[in-house]
């Protein structure tokens, strides 16, 4: 019996009997490998994307065992898309799927809001590139300084590195950290071009410290040059946030909306990812269309015919449902070099949870790392092949090569890249090491949208399999609170030492009655290293010998 699933251009054909009786993985039997490849291969003809999980050690019994779990997972994802409170800890809907198909939103107001934002972003990007919107000095904008942390930085960085071509659109620079040296280098590289630079600050709440600090540094440098901040400043934030109110008060050049129901790590199809794409002349409609097509393909409620469920099942079995294997991401295309970092946040922030939904301590997670092939073959692939077997590889390939790099002496660089990928995949399999492969006929905005959407859905399904909330981040919030406590402690230490009296870390702790001696040592080590008038007497190798004062 055959099943045919038609979802627009999507067509998957599978023989149920064959699927349920495919042979187990064999490292040495090429015929068995070929059978598994045929039985487990998924293909989307219109997108030109293949998913091959045949080199993962999943078997027919695993599919049978996971069937009921996936039935529940598919229902949960359907409810999520219909507007259920999927993030129960924060009592929020999870609506990133609506961003590429606004008609799926639970009400017309949300649908219209999404569609309007896409139009505004597209028009703004075009007008900036074409010079209809100019810098305050009357010149065309030449650069963008993008200020954002986490998903507000990684998503835009992926869009730029993956999709920008030489001399296309504006040049991009990033403040994605609060490292003073990093900020100094970016501002130094911009130089006088800061006067023709759009400064985009991204913060959902409008109160995140890192973007605020970066924004103030950019503002100070621009105003010191005699620039006009408001005429170059753009905000991407929620309506009525602190940042939104500031932008309105100061009449910034433009404001774009973020939505309460979209988390940072799934915000790439919102203004967070679309605005940078528009500013390099990228077809944002194609990017959204690719994501929407993959969403359709991953709504199929059949484990064997849904690429996201195939991938989630392979992850689950590889790590015994406990994340016992790392995911090593190996994209064989320089444009996707940032993709492993993007997946680190998407996967690890979503799945790395201490508690399940029932309050049980589970310590779930799936570690992700990687760079790009074939570079990695000359780095850590040695350990993957011969070292500890605690991972599975995710190969990503693009079949179509660019035309302006010709064959020289009948040697095509793309042939070597393909050979290196196949060779590494084969070498890992021969060693009994697991891998899956995603292949794309070509790479463009549409395929990037599809690739992102595939992993988003796989993460959502995996979260359902292990019964965790994949849409909150209590560990991140704990880190923010701890950082705020340290900054508060530093302020109190500085207030105490303002009297000029020399004190040890222990004495400071005794007077303040908060923090710890170790935290105070760290604070004072930093302060004394930065010429703020603090001195230390004693041996830095013996912390208890040190006495601190304000000179």
UniProtKB/Swiss-Prot annotation:
Localization per record: Cytoplasm
This protein's pathway: Carbohydrate biosynthesis; gluconeogenesis; Carbohydrate degradation; glycolysis; D-glyceraldehyde 3-phosphate and glycerone phosphate from D-glucose: step 2/4
Molecular function per GO: carbohydrate derivative binding; glucose-6-phosphate isomerase activity; monosaccharide binding
SUPFAM superfamilies in the record: SIS domain
Gene Ontology biological process terms in this record: gluconeogenesis; glucose 6-phosphate metabolic process; glycolytic process
InterPro entries: G6P_Isomerase, Phosphoglucose_isomerase_CS, SIS_dom_sf, SIS_PGI_1, SIS_PGI_2
CDD domains: SIS_PGI_1, SIS_PGI_2
Catalytic residues of the enzyme: 349 (proton donor), 378, 480
Gene Ontology CC: one annotated term: cytosol
UniProt keyword Heme present: no
Keyword Lyase: no
Record keywords: Cytoplasm, Gluconeogenesis, Glycolysis, Isomerase
EC number: 5.3.1.9
The reaction(s) this protein catalyses: alpha-D-glucose 6-phosphate = beta-D-fructose 6-phosphate
EC main group: isomerase
Family: Belongs to the GPI family.
Function recorded in the entry: Catalyzes the reversible isomerization of glucose-6-phosphate to fructose-6-phosphate.
NCBIfam families associated with the record: PRK14096.1
Xref: HAMAP family: G6P_isomerase
Protein's name according to its UniProt entry: Glucose-6-phosphate isomerase
Source species of the chain: Prochlorococcus marinus (strain MIT 9313)
